[in-house]
Amino acid sequence: MSAPTRRPAPDAPGAAGIAPAPPAPAAKPAAGKPKRIGPEQVTGAQSVIRSLEELGVEVIFGIPGGAVLPVYDPLFDSKKLRHVLVRHEQGAGHAASGYAHATGKVGVCMATSGPGATNLVTALADAQMDSIPVVAVTGQVGRTLIGTDAFQEADISGITMPITKHNFLVVRQRNPAVLAEAFHIAASGRPARCSVDIPKDVLQGQCTFSWPPRIHLPGYKPTTKPHSRQIRERAKLIAAARKPVLYVGGGVIRGEASEQLRELAELTGIPVVTTLMARGAFPDSHRQHLGMPGMHGTVAAVAALQRSDLLIALGTRFDDRVTGKLDTFAPEAKVIHADIDPAEIGKNRHADVPIVGDVKAVIAELVEILRHDGAPGNLDIADWWAYLDDVQSTYPLSYGPQSDGSLGPEYVIEKLGQIAGPDALYVAGVGHDQMWAAQFISYEKPRTWLNSGGQGTMGFAIPAAMGAKMGRPEAEVWAIDGDGCFQMTNQELATCAVEGIPIKVALINNGNLGMVRQWQTLFYEERYSQTDLGHPLAPHPDFVKLAEALGCVGLRCEREEDVVDVINAARAINDRPVVIAFIVGADAQVWPMVAAGTSNDEIQAARGIRPLFDDETEGTP
């Protein structure tokens, strides 16, 4: 039986009928008409704190030090700002990212000069790649010492120039204006990182504070309103397509466009794929959702992109992990590419219809045109759906028991998602645990899935979960981490314990660097060079004892029959962080897989099992 032209949304209540969550607050400073303050004489440091208060900042993640210490003195008196004293500046950066990702607001981190600032660099690069709005405030040596190799001097502006949207070195007393400009740049257009570096003598000197300051950014005018002619061209291509796909990226979440996306999808009946950064932008339970594309995506999602005749790319950047070998990606497809960042249009794949603008406005205008022209009812995609349904039913996401009888990590993560449910926030590390969490947890709402997608930064999960919990204290927040990632930033659990931030950690402990080991298995003749972290049955460290030493509850699980009980036990503890060490086998692997640098046509559903697409036969090379 052929599939209908468009699949109706389920009428019955339940998981499939969950409505999208209301949009989170926009990534911008506090709304409303600003009150006027001043002018009054204050120190530069006081002007920083006053400015952050007026910008609506709620929490700062940071560590004091010599050059930034003047800021920490007036911070002591603030009744509006909460400071979270992290254990490492990288943790401050990732926590600010987690806060921003979970709330849609600008995250703030703070560090001193030199090593304090350079310790933020990894987190800065991570947030920049994933379009997370964060402002980093750093102290700098005095102006007369800059360039003299003074104690704890580092050219953080020069270092971060390639990995921030904009950075400021404040050499005269205009802290309020600079901070307001940094927040505006970070939150508008394509969200990203901004860095504000302030010399110590500027912080200690006197200045005149008044609010709101005058923002002077004559060269910064991001395009948000799409061109109507481009939208009409796009509507014509959609009406003519026979194998269209909505290729959805993280920009749909950043742009608060999930409701508009659902309206467009249901209006047209077009299948939807959501990238790693877009999980939750469209409900997993929806009949039109084919899952995640890319290196470890579903076979149906990969097949849909490869065999499509029209890619409707929304807020996505055609990343190599999605396209595979670029010159073989979706070879017959025309491309409509909508993105707020003009630099992304045509960067990796030529766009037949380029659209620069806010994705929410783009989709809304497209829906209006399609409704007016009556195009949705004329789409002839029944055969396309029949093909995709067949692929999806033949190659569903699945997993089997571990060959050594050990606890399966996929089972653990799937059960966690079922028990904690779609209202919880899931924050992943990088590698196996990240991919399994993207595959086997059902995401129904935006901003419930946080991960390091572009940089793939190990150590992201624990501090980012801490930041997410600070921003969404009512939500249940789970960090899903491997033992390799966990050992890079687990010290922030002490921060959580001291600050009263009760995150929960599902630690997938296989005793090795799992994703690297998988590549060694597949491509390096099982030569496991420097990937063993210690046997999981006799781990170093003992993660239960480590968790307890850091002020958390430590739990351990080795058997499948105990998984549900231990997860429920962790959920019942809400006065401190909880770490569950799930002891899993060393050789669990992530499938499906497209090997790096190869065509998506070479996808393997499982090791040695390569699907045959519609134009292939047995023996096709």
Curated annotation (Swiss-Prot):
Q: Which GO terms describe its molecular function?
A: acetolactate synthase activity; flavin adenine dinucleotide binding; magnesium ion binding; thiamine pyrophosphate binding
Give the record's cofactor note, including how many are bound: Binds 1 Mg(2+) ion per subunit.
Q: What class of enzyme is it?
A: transferase
Membrane spanning residue stretches: none
Residue ranges, annotated region (Disordered): 1-39
Return the CDD domains for the record: TPP_AHAS, TPP_PYR_POX_like
Which cofactors? Answer: Mg(2+); thiamine diphosphate
Q: Which GO terms describe its cellular component?
A: acetolactate synthase complex
Region of interest: Thiamine pyrophosphate binding:
432-512
Keyword annotations for this protein, in alphabetical order, are: Amino-acid biosynthesis, Branched-chain amino acid biosynthesis, FAD, Flavoprotein, Magnesium, Metal-binding, Thiamine pyrophosphate, Transferase
What InterPro entries does this protein's entry cite? Acetolactate_synth_lsu, AHAS_TPP, DHS-like_NAD/FAD-binding_dom, THDP-binding, Thiamin_PyroP_enz_cen_dom, Thiamin_PyroP_enz_TPP-bd_dom, TPP-bd_CS, TPP_enz
Q: Which residues bind FAD?
A: 190, 296-317, 339-358
What are the binding positions for Mg(2+) in this chain? 483, 510
Q: Does the keyword Amino-acid biosynthesis apply?
A: yes
Write the Enzyme Commission number(s) for this entry.
Answer: 2.2.1.6
Q: Which PANTHER family match?
A: ACETOLACTATE SYNTHASE CATALYTIC SUBUNIT, MITOCHONDRIAL, THIAMINE PYROPHOSPHATE ENZYMES
Q: Which family does it belong to?
A: Belongs to the TPP enzyme family.
This chain's protein is named Acetolactate synthase
Species source reads Mycobacterium avium
Q: What is the lineage of its organism?
A: Bacteria, Bacillati, Actinomycetota, Actinomycetes, Mycobacteriales
